[in-house]
Amino acid sequence: MKKIVILGGGYGGVLTAKKLAKKFKNNKEVEIKLIDRNPYHTLLTELHEVAANRAPEDSIKIDLKKIFAGLKVDVVLDEISNIDFKGKKLQSEKATYAYDYLVIGTGSKPTFFGIPGAEENTLSFWSYDDAVALKRQTRDMFTLAAKEKNAAVRRSMLTFVVVGAGFTGVELIGEMAEYREDLCKEFYIDPSEVRLIVADMAPKILPILPDKLIQKAESYLRKMNVEIVTNAKITEVGKGSVALGEKNVVDTHTVVWTAGVEGSEIVGTLDVQQQGRKRIVTNEHLESVDHKNVYVVGDNIFFIPEGETRPVPQMVENAEQAAPVIAANITADINGTPKKAYKPGFHGTMVSIGSRYGVANVGLPGKFFMLTGFMAMLSKHFINMFYLSQVVGFNKVWTYMMHEFFHVENRKSFVGGYFSKRSPNFWLVPLRMLLGGMWVYEGVDKLKKIWEDPDKIFLIPAAPNATDAASAASQAVDAVKETVDAQSAASAVTTAKEAVEALPVPGFIYDTTNWFMDLMFYNPDGTYTFLAKWFQLGMVCAEIVFGIMLIVGLFSAIASIATIGMAVMIWSTKMASTEMLWYVAAAIACIGGSGSVFGLDYYVLPWLKKHWKKIPLVRRWYLYTD
């Protein structure tokens, strides 16, 4: 039995475990174990949204048991204190874990560069708990400031300093600038009293980006009334102040530290070669240069690719690209096949500044292009959803879309509040029942005609090569009359041609429809095939069934979408009048939960959702919503 242990449930650890589980899903001789001290995976790149109350607290946590449901990965909650490389064991206070192959992905922690008071008097910003603590600290300061009579104390309470103007610091200060507006309204504080500062020892913010994007970011931050302090010689952080230089001491109750990271605490204690703030040196296969059965993933990697002068960056894409290489190389070790070399090709960086603006430098290696505003935010959201699709599939992508686009408050989205305006579903009840009633009426009326003459085809137009033109025209008129209200159709058109052309159809769609009907419904002599009769009966029954579903509010979303599909089918044959537009518009309005009020969906969907999530295949493929 080969034992693979992955230490750390961060980006790299989770993706490596999933890749290994896929490779060894049918191999009973391989055991995969992931160890982390938390029961959840944290989306570190979204911490700023929780800290500034834009996203729910649980939106950046993903249950590890959910991620690995149905997969060959044993999740263990424990905190490892030592690794015995010679004995191939991981040790904690309560257990010992043996391994044949080890993947170290314990991530990073803040580094304070020996600055006096920095560690003791600042809020770190590198975990879920940090984000929640900062949100509470910010609210507490506004709560106290609203009651404070001393102007100097009030001013210090309403001064917030973020040390570090890299990606994390800039994204955080941008979110806090938007959060300021909300809190000022809530606590009746003039926004001009609130001071936001982002400071860095470097000569410019976001130094990894091109100067043009840096200027755009600075301009937007200043527009948000954020003070930018560069070349800040941070010498000390006191209990109520921070020194941003010899003559620039800022009184504040809140200093957030985002100025840099180093390897996690356990990495610093390991007997392995390290460089660059406690990063483990690896070879091209991402193995520790000291231990060939030990691999390194994510922020812990120190590896300089061929032709480069700098080590791979500590960013999510590095973890994403390293994970499949490590999984492939462990597989190669076990199977005795050649290993893969790590050849990363990064696709750029994206920075959001608040919920509505961002800058990005993205593309392919050697061919990058700059984005700002809407397009930069679109690219960032796309990359986030792509990552989530790898980790928890549809489930988390759906949740992400809800809190980023559809359930936002105060228009905090790059698409504004256009997709998040909500109204009570009970206003849709009359429309839903009317729409259902119309479809039932149409279906029952047509069913009577089928009952009278089962062989008469009136829902499918006559073949173009039918010999009796007059009969064809008559059938076309009958078809239109059966599709829409007969009296309205008669008053709206005078000939079959006019009726059929009531709603125009693009030529390529009409030609495709004709090709399909020639294949399925017409004989060479222009008469109908036996399928035509059954298709007609099926359409009529569908109109009745979906109409009833709408009336009683059962699976109203499915019924609404189905009626839209039927309307499109009718339209594609040039047999739909303008009345069909009403059917489609009403169905679109009824998709969004119209059956949850005075409908069976109110009872059925919660029960179905509860039992649906219990199906192993559903959980394995994340085909459910929370």
Feature locations, PLM:
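Central hydrophobic cores of alpha-helical transmembrane segments
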Residues: 559-570, 583-587
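Rossmann-like dinucleotide-binding core of oxidoreductases
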Residues: 154-209, 216, 227-229, 312-332, ...
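C-terminal, flexible cofactor-proximal segment of oxidoreductases
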Residues: 318, 322-415
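FAD-site-proximal beta/loop scaffold in flavoenzymes
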Residues: 120-153, 240-243, 247-318
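A Rossmann-like FAD-binding core segment of flavoenzymes
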Residues: 75, 81-82, 178-282
